[in-house]
Curated annotation (Swiss-Prot):
<dbReference type="GO" id="GO:0005524">
    <property type="term" value="F:ATP binding"/>
</dbReference>
<dbReference type="InterPro" id="IPR018370">
    <property type="entry name" value="Chaperonin_Cpn60_CS"/>
</dbReference>
<dbReference type="Pfam" id="PF00118">
    <property type="entry name" value="Cpn60_TCP1"/>
</dbReference>
<dbReference type="InterPro" id="IPR002423">
    <property type="entry name" value="Cpn60/GroEL/TCP-1"/>
</dbReference>
<dbReference type="InterPro" id="IPR001844">
    <property type="entry name" value="Cpn60/GroEL"/>
</dbReference>
<dbReference type="GO" id="GO:0042026">
    <property type="term" value="P:protein refolding"/>
</dbReference>
<comment type="similarity">
    <text>Belongs to the chaperonin (HSP60) family.</text>
</comment>
<dbReference type="InterPro" id="IPR027409">
    <property type="entry name" value="GroEL-like_apical_dom_sf"/>
</dbReference>
<comment type="subunit">
    <text>Forms a cylinder of 14 subunits composed of two heptameric rings stacked back-to-back. Interacts with the co-chaperonin GroES.</text>
</comment>
<dbReference type="InterPro" id="IPR027410">
    <property type="entry name" value="TCP-1-like_intermed_sf"/>
</dbReference>
<keyword id="KW-0143">Chaperone</keyword>
<feature type="binding site">
    <location>
        <begin position="30"/>
        <end position="33"/>
    </location>
    <ligand>
        <name>ATP</name>
    </ligand>
</feature>
<keyword id="KW-0963">Cytoplasm</keyword>
<keyword id="KW-0067">ATP-binding</keyword>
<dbReference type="GO" id="GO:0005737">
    <property type="term" value="C:cytoplasm"/>
</dbReference>
<feature type="binding site">
    <location>
        <begin position="87"/>
        <end position="91"/>
    </location>
    <ligand>
        <name>ATP</name>
    </ligand>
</feature>
<protein>
    <recommendedName>
        <fullName>Chaperonin GroEL</fullName>
        <ecNumber>5.6.1.7</ecNumber>
    </recommendedName>
</protein>
Length: 549
């Protein structure tokens, strides 16, 4: 086992604090509308330029192992805030730094670390309640646009495109961000349900120019088994041919004689038909087939419930306005499903999400919910250079997470004002003893830090602005973008409640662990074993080899 280095008490805390401050000082320069860029060197390719706090935090590794432990713990704050709310990483880092700095001063003055931590925790619980009380629900597109704009570092075009995407596919719809080919941002919306399964045979293609299958007003047959015998499909094919409509078959698989016969019928024009595999596997496939059935007012043909494929009638088939099938995807547009049935299915999936304890299951259920609740929107990022593209894509993804968080829990006044008001709301809170009360005051002072940092990044005087904001009420605050005071909500400066809440909770949690640290252990540096052995004696010995040539 490798030897270890151990530090105790104040020596350990001083080293840890140095690491905390190095990381936090690099991250906090990005905060606010006038936050600065950070340039990160990469071992390959050009440097990255970013204003994203978590990107900066993830790049920092310190040489001193004790200092690095402090830096990594603050990095954890940024990562947790990012995972929970998708934004607020810089705010969380600034809060953690403030709590650790204030707390360690108190410990150095002789206060009990455990009571200090209890006081901080008590203050945070009360502050979170105050934040929730001041939260305003997001009901209109304008608020979504404002949240997106603020999160994307005051880029109004980003706010607008996210608001438009949410308007088109719904707040629970699928919105993806990808790199585009143009200089400007573009929004591509796919109305309806899309899943990752393409046509089973290229002979189904009827749009040669783009290599897709397009079916207008098709019947949709949903089967929860493999189809290899064409006899099972004859009744359905005859009924569809008489109705004069195309047919889409979605089954576990279509193979052998059945697939060959479908291809021949399609090429001869007897029945316009296409077949795709059902999405997912096992129980998830069954559930997704049922989702499609709900969307298209069809029935899943399953032998488990006693239904036979040979006895299918046109009433069992689903219908949609249009279906587009490519090599890899199937899009069902405008299914004729009853709205009440679709909403009931959506509610059922929401219930399953709440009951599920697996992150993977939750993610898959969320995908199903999005497919049913709305279409799919793709935001294509435009930029002049690859470096700008990557920086902008990161900002748009942050803004998208922030707007989702805003829809979930509402919004509060931005610019650090909500935390100032929450701090004012808990100023009379007292702990069980003097040290706990001091811990509450540590948290209250730390909650001023984000506003102070935003103002400092603008080049203004933090204390002057803080006093002015303190003297105001409600949403009155400081607009760092143009150095004016006013109602933050009316000026469109909003923060999602979830982002502010998560930043405060995670910062206090990790800072509390640091304050109660009494020892730090790390691997001792490996001492150099010395240089290469002396080989000078080999010269003479090898000289005798000359006679062998």
């Amino acid at each position: 086992m490798a030897a270890k280095d151990v530090l105790f008490g104040n020596d350990a805390r001083v080293k840890m604090l140095r690491g905390v401050n190095i990381l936090a000082d690099a991250v906090k320069v990005t905060l606010g509308p006038k936050g600065r860029n950070v340039v990160i060197d990469k071992s390959f390719g050009g440097p990255i330029i970013t204003k994203d706090g978590v990107t900066v935090a993830k790049e920092i590794e310190l040489e001193d192992k004790f200092e690095n432990m402090g830096a990594q713990m603050v990095k954890e704050v940024a990562s947790k805030a990012n995972d929970e709310a998708g934004d607020g990483t810089t705010t969380a880092t600034v809060l953690a730094q403030a709590i650790v700095n204030e707390g360690l001063k108190s410990i150095a003055a002789g206060m009990n670390p455990m009571d200090l931590k209890r006081g901080i925790d008590k203050a945070v619980i009360a502050a979170v309640e105050a934040l929730k009380e001041s939260s305003t629900p997001v009901t209109d597109n304008k608020a979504i646009e404002q949240v997106g704009t603020i999160s994307a570092n005051s880029d109004e075009t980003v706010g607008k495109i996210i608001a438009t995407a949410m308007e088109k596919v719904g707040t629970e719809g699928v919105i993806t961000v990808e790199e585009g080919q143009a200089l400007t941002d573009e929004l591509d919306v796919v109305e309806g349900m899309q899943f990752d399964r393409g046509y089973l045979s290229p002979y189904f293609i009827n749009k040669q120019e783009n290599g897709t299958v397009e079916l207008e007003n098709p019947f949709i047959l949903l089967v929860d088994k493999k189809i290899s015998n064409i006899r099972e499909l004859l009744t359905t094919l005859e009924g569809v041919a008489k109705a004069g409509k195309p047919l889409l078959i979605i089954a576990e698989d279509v193979e052998g004689e059945a697939l060959a016969t479908l291809v021949v019928n399609n090429m001869r024009g007897i029945v316009k038909v296409a077949a795709v595999k059902a999405p997912g596997f096992g129980d998830r496939r069954k559930a997704m087939l049922q989702d499609v059935a709900t969307l298209t007012a069809g029935t899943v043909i399953s032998e488990e419930i006693g239904m036979e494929l040979e006895k299918v009638t046109l009433e069992d088939l689903g219908q949609a306005k249009r279906v587009v099938i490519s090599k890899d995807t199937t899009i069902i547009i405008d299914g004729i499903g009853v709205e009440a049935d679709i909403q009931a299915r959506v509610s059922q999936i929401r219930g399953q999400i709440e009951d599920s304890s697996s992150d993977y299951d939750k993610e898959k259920l969320q995908e199903r919910l999005a497919k049913l609740a709305g279409g799919v929107a793709v935001i294509k990022i435009g930029a002049a250079t690859e470096m700008e593209m990557k920086e902008k894509k990161s900002r748009v993804e942050d803004a998208l997470h922030a707007t989702r968080a805003a829809v979930e829990e509402g919004v509060v006044a931005g610019g650090g004002v909500a935390l100032i008001r929450a701090a004012d709301a808990i100023k009379d809170l007292e702990g069980a003893n003097e040290d706990q009360t001091h811990g509450i005051n540590v948290a209250i002072r730390a909650m001023e830090a984000p506003l102070r940092q935003i103002v400092a990044n603008c080049g203004d005087e933090p204390s002057v602005v803080l006093n002015e904001v303190r003297n105001g009420k409600g949403n009155y605050g400081y607009n760092a973008g143009n150095s004016t005071y006013g109602d933050m909500i009316e000026m469109g400066i909003l923060d999602p409640t979830k982002v502010t809440r998560s930043a405060l909770q995670f910062a206090a949690s990790v800072a509390g662990l640091m304050l109660t640290t009494e020892a730090m252990i790390t691997d001792a540096p490996v001492k150099d074993a010395g240089g290469m052995p002396d080989m000078s004696g080999m010269g003479g010995g090898m000289g005798g080899m000359g006679g062998m040539m």
